[in-house]
Design a protein with these regions (language model features):
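Glycine-rich P-loop/Walker A and Walker A-like loops and their local beta1-loop-alpha1 context
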Residues: 1-42
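Structural motif
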Residues: 4, 90-93, 127
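Short acidic, S/G/P-rich loop/turn micro-motifs used as interaction or catalytic elements
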Residues: 9-13, 36-38, 58, 97-105, ...
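Short, structured coil segments at secondary-structure junctions
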Residues: 24, 44-47, 145-147
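Nucleotide-state-sensitive switch-loop elements of NTP-binding domains
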Residues: 37-68
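Phosphate-binding/switch loop-helix module in NTP-utilizing enzymes
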Residues: 59-114
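Substrate-engagement module of ASCE P-loop NTPases
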Residues: 108-134
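Phosphate-binding/switch region of NTP-binding enzymes
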Residues: 124-125, 131-153
Length: 153
């Protein structure tokens, strides 16, 4: 199932942390686009979580660095990370819309379609969080169409 959460920008990080904690019995991947690993490390601990950090090059064992401007590398990293886990898996993006800071919105929309199609094929539980303010209308429409459930908070 793919859940899209549309919220105020000041709520994004709290919703990200609470979303990840709901998957405490599963293995999964957290993609950090708005805050680096160091900002969430103390709030989210667990050997079954792999972080893809697009903002810093952390030396932690459970962290992979991918530049936010390289969506192909990000897609490959998500794919490989999810495939490394057995059983039920999850994927949580802390602020998907932030990808448009380093990439054109149309490119991010295509990336979203591709990635969410793959997530559905892999039977992964996914939570995509976007800030209401400043999110490209086309990207938001694509995310809403691709999601199984949309929550506005």
């Amino acid at each position: 199932m793919i859940k899209l959460i549309v919220t105020k920008s000041e709520k994004v990080q709290d919703l990200f942390v609470s979303s990840v904690k709901k998957f405490s019995k599963m293995s999964g991947v957290c993609v950090l686009v708005a805050k680096p690993y160091s900002a969430v490390a103390n709030k989210l601990k667990g050997s079954r979580i792999l972080f893809i950090d697009t903002l810093s090059e952390s030396e932690e064992e459970n962290v992979i660095h991918v530049p936010p401007s390289n969506l192909t590398a990000l897609s490959i990293a998500v794919n490989q990370a999810l495939q490394s886990f057995e059983g039920k898996k999850f994927l949580v993006f802390d602020s998907f819309s932030t990808l448009t800071v380093r990439n054109p919105p149309k490119v991010v929309s295509k990336f979203a379609l591709f990635l969410l199609e793959r997530v559905r094929t892999w039977d992964v539980e996914a939570v995509i969080i976007v800030a209401k303010e400043g999110t490209d209308a086309e990207l938001l429409a694509v995310l809403k169409q691709s999601a199984d459930k949309v929550e506005e908070r």
